[in-house]
């Protein structure tokens, strides 16, 4: 009877171990998909900036010309970031994740978007400062146009980063409590660990 109970426990724990692995793979695929889609959004914004502002730089209004020039520059940088981000998410291997790997990835992506949001606030502030001090500069139109563009780009990125952070944060809530239970198996071994 004891052997039967031990065998039943072994089968149950093994099933849980495989179910946990499948759940981790599913979670990682979803996180990767969110990352790729967010890079497509950033890439779309960047391309739109480059196209629209590329045409709009042909204006007689000097302030608006500088505004659009800066939009094109930001668009190029953001397009490169979006391309590299998409490529990085695409090549990421998620076929055999451990719980520690999943938690590390989730923590890293949430921190990244929080740090980015902080930088976005700095961009908006820098653009505002350029705008407000433009009259004291040798080329006030350039400072004002660049400042307005930096405020626009920083404002968009702040909203973008806040939304993407919220998406990843809500997705990460699926892991709440999971880190307390760890099941693993290997050749000749089986372990179930519950952390209080």
Ranges and model annotations:
Residues 42-46, 71, 150:
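Aromatic- and histidine-enriched alpha-helix N-cap/loop-to-helix transition segments
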Residues 45-67:
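Long, highly hydrophobic alpha-helical transmembrane signal-anchor segments
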Residues 62-78:
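Loop-to-helix transition at the N-terminal end of transmembrane alpha-helices
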Residues 43-53, 119-128:
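Canonical alpha-helical transmembrane segments of integral membrane proteins
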Residues 52-56, 77-91:
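Canonical alpha-helical transmembrane segments
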């Amino acid at each position: 009877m004891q052997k039967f109970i031990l065998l039943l426990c072994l089968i149950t724990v093994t099933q849980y171990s495989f179910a946990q692995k499948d759940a981790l793979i599913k979670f990682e695929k979803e996180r990767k998909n969110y990352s790729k889609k967010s890079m497509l959004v950033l890439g779309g914004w960047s391309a739109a900036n480059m196209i629209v502002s590329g045409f709009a730089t042909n204006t007689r209004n000097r302030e608006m010309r500088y505004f659009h020039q800066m939009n094109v520059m930001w668009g190029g940088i953001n397009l490169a970031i979006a391309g590299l981000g998409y490529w990085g998410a695409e090549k990421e291997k998620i076929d055999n994740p451990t719980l520690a790997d999943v938690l590390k990835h989730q923590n890293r992506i949430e921190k990244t978007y929080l740090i980015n949001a902080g930088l976005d606030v700095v961009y908006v502030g820098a653009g505002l400062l350029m705008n407000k001090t433009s009259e004291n500069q040798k080329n006030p139109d350039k400072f004002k146009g660049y400042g307005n563009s930096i405020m626009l780009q920083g404002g968009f990125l702040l909203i973008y980063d806040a939304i993407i952070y919220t998406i990843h944060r809500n997705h990460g809530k699926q892991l709440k409590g999971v880190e307390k239970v760890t099941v693993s198996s290997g050749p000749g071994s089986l372990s179930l660990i519950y952390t209080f």
